[in-house]
Amino acid sequence: MRTLRHFTLSLLLAITAPLLVSQQPSIIYSTSYNSHFPDGVTGGGEAWNGMGVAHDGTLYYVLSSGSPNIAGQMYSFNPKTQVITHLADLSDIVGEGNMKAVAQGKSHVNFVEANGKLYFSTHLGYYNQAGGLERAGAPPPGYLPYLGGHFVSYDLTTGKFENLAKAPGGEGIITFNMDVQRGRLYGITWPTGHFLRYDLKTKKLKDFGTLFLGGESGVIGSTYRGICRRIIVDPRDGSAYFTTGEGTIHRYHYDTEVIDDVPGITLKKDYFGTQDIAGHGMAYNWRAAFFNPTDNAIYAVNGRSGYLFRVDINTPSVQVLKRITSEPSTASGMFDRFEYGYMGFTLGPDGHTVYYLTGAPIPSRPNTAGTTNPNRRADGCHFVTYDLTTKKYVDHGQLVLEDGTPVAAPQSIAVGLDGTVYTISYVPRNGKRTIELISFHP
């Protein structure tokens, strides 16, 4: 009998041991840098996109500020020499550095390179929280209100910045892309969601108004609408696509400058769960997206559910491919805590692998009372890939800093020429939390 028990126990351990091992999350160690971001920034700063790798492999990035009097700062990083260079203060480059106005706190967009220049836009970073929502912060005594986001270029040879145009109505430019071939810049403003076009040849800005009802200044449950964070340009004909929370895909036509709806398709899918289009979050907008020239399709992710999907405008059709949340999130069966979703989403250097930085519950993290609550969910960060050719999903594991501290709140991604992945995370330094550049190798 004892022999049988020992045999049964041994067999059980042999079967379950591999399962137990496989459930232990892999760890990816990252390297953090020191950009010498200004002290005194409220909340340690933020980072939402604000990155890009130029043709020579140099990384350009912006560390954002939530303070009314400290602007976001732009830097370059040379991967060969490991040297970080401070390039500019965002308020200075648009001529507002000495105006004592609420600062240009962010660049909320990915940089686009064209004809020897980087193009991007600026945005405000100073908010007031009202009922759990971000509203433009009232200027401190003696300060002017925020003056509006700008379209900006940076000459990679001369180092000169050029202020191209300013958004009307004192709104920031939260979403940006560029038609490189035709020389047009596109943006969506915050908080009301006006669609903008700037033409490099004519140097004229056009405001098409908003399709977002009250935008993110609207009333929750009524006129509130989350604003799309990605404009996708089809290089074949210059069409620019963006979404609204109802799940509609809108198309700007380059030749006629008309905006209409893509007929016959919607991003409102049962798989994405029931989304409140007037509630806090992205609803049925795509959260992040890119155009894949291999099959001339748009690949995007639904922010709340983490489902990857493919949009074929020519058919037209929407195909749900795979939930690409982290393994811990998938196993929990729950949404990630951050209802907006994640923007660290891009096509890898091989042209067929999706790179995605996504949230994950950190188990057994102490709560504010100092005790452990197994039901409390706090976001860590996992690096996930999905091969569009083989349909293979891989969660490569949790990102941590050099000392094992979980990487927190990454909402940006850029891939170097050597395959190094860059993002921006909160980093503890000198007893404080600051925002900083980090990198890792997949």
Where are these regions (language model features)?
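Surface-exposed loop and turn segments in beta-propeller and other repeat-based domains
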Residues: 28, 32-40, 87-103, 162-171, ...
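Conserved beta-propeller blade signature
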Residues: 59-62, 118-119, 184-187, 239-242, ...
